[in-house]
């Protein structure tokens, strides 16, 4: 059950990250405070995605809290690295994100996946 909560947290956090990325590209920068406030209260697509992203992070924290009660911290924390993989893949697949493929990034994803496999593989207990 803890693994399920952890995976929910990763998926929701990844979607929230993509939502906030969309919002950042469609809202004025915070350095232009009044323009940002005006755009936010106009509640256009950028503002809606900002709210969706923030609510997503809140839901992700709830799932993370539940996961930590049922899963070892070493395993739960390792799951968070999956978010990097999901966001990278989504940025290449989703239209308008212009994510780029590179062998260096693929090598990083392979390292993340290898590490997760090592952490989550069942261990055999040795008797001495």
Swiss-Prot record:
What molecular function does GO assign, one term?
A: carbohydrate derivative transmembrane transporter activity
Residue intervals passing through the bilayer: 1-21, 36-56, 77-97, 101-121
Query: GO CC terms for this protein?
Result: plasma membrane
Q: How does it assemble?
A: Heterodimer of ArnE and ArnF.
* PANTHER family according to UniProt: 4-AMINO-4-DEOXY-L-ARABINOSE-PHOSPHOUNDECAPRENOL FLIPPASE SUBUNIT ARNF-RELATED, SMR FAMILY PROTON-DEPENDENT DRUG EFFLUX TRANSPORTER SUGE
Identify the domain of life.
Answer: Bacteria
Gene3D superfamilies according to UniProt: 1.10.3730.20
Q: Give the principal location in a single coarse category.
A: membrane
Q: Which residues point to the Cytoplasmic side?
A: 57-76, 122-128
Give the protein name, as stated in the record: Probable 4-amino-4-deoxy-L-arabinose-phosphoundecaprenol flippase subunit ArnF
Q: Where in the cell is it found?
A: Cell inner membrane
**Which range is the signal sequence, renumbered to this chain?**
none
Q: Which InterPro entries match?
A: Flippase_ArnF, Small_drug/metabolite_transptr
In what pathway does it function?
A: Bacterial outer membrane biogenesis; lipopolysaccharide biosynthesis
Q: How does this protein sit in the membrane?
A: Multi-pass membrane protein
Q: Which gene encodes it?
A: arnF
Q: Which SUPFAM superfamilies match?
A: Multidrug resistance efflux transporter EmrE (SSF103481)
Keywords, comma-separated and alphabetical:
Cell inner membrane, Cell membrane, Lipid A biosynthesis, Lipid biosynthesis, Lipid metabolism, Lipopolysaccharide biosynthesis, Membrane, Transmembrane, Transmembrane helix, Transport
Gene Ontology BP annotations = lipid A biosynthetic process; lipopolysaccharide biosynthetic process
Function comment: Translocates 4-amino-4-deoxy-L-arabinose-phosphoundecaprenol (alpha-L-Ara4N-phosphoundecaprenol) from the cytoplasmic to the periplasmic side of the inner membrane.
Periplasmic-side stretches of the chain, per the record, are 22-35, 98-100
Protein family (similarity comment): Belongs to the ArnF family.
């Amino acid at each position: 059950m803890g693994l399920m909560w952890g995976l929910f947290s990763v998926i929701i956090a990844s979607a929230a990250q993509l939502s906030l990325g969309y919002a950042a590209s469609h809202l004025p920068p915070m350095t232009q405070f009044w323009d940002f406030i005006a755009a936010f209260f106009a509640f256009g697509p950028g503002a809606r995605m900002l709210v969706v992203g923030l609510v997503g992070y809140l839901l992700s924290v709830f799932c993370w809290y539940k996961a930590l009660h049922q899963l070892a911290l070493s395993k739960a924390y390792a799951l968070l690295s999956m978010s990097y993989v999901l966001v990278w893949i989504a940025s290449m697949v989703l239209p308008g994100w212009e994510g780029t493929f590179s062998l260096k990034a693929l090598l990083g994803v392979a390292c993340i996946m290898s590490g997760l496999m090592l952490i989550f593989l069942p261990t055999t207990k040795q008797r001495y």
